[in-house]
Amino acid sequence: MRLLIIEDERTLCDAVSKSLEKDGFEVDVCYTGAEALEKTGADKYDLIILDLNLPRMDGMDILKKLRLNDQETKVLILSARGNAADKIAGLDAGANDYMAKPFHLGELGARVRSLTRRRFIQHDV
């Protein structure tokens, strides 16, 4: 399973990436919205982990652009914006799940496994 992490905080990105790689996922990372749109245009991912607070391009804008061309790829928002209004907006914009920072790596791993398992089952049916 291929994952893309879109997160500008490199230390956090590295920790999440290493944790998910230990779970057997192939992980790519990008640190800007422009880089994210370029990668998603060129490559196919099973799941995208998306921060909302990115430089020069808001994560919600990235999500909306992704959803114009791709309704299949699962998207998990991972953001410091943890209030109910932001969660509702993210899910309404097409995210499949939403986690607020700070978070536990074990919980993130469980959510990623759940989302990718559901995607795998949907393709088999």
Predicted segments, located by residue:
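N-terminal/domain-start alpha-helical segments
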Residues: 1-122
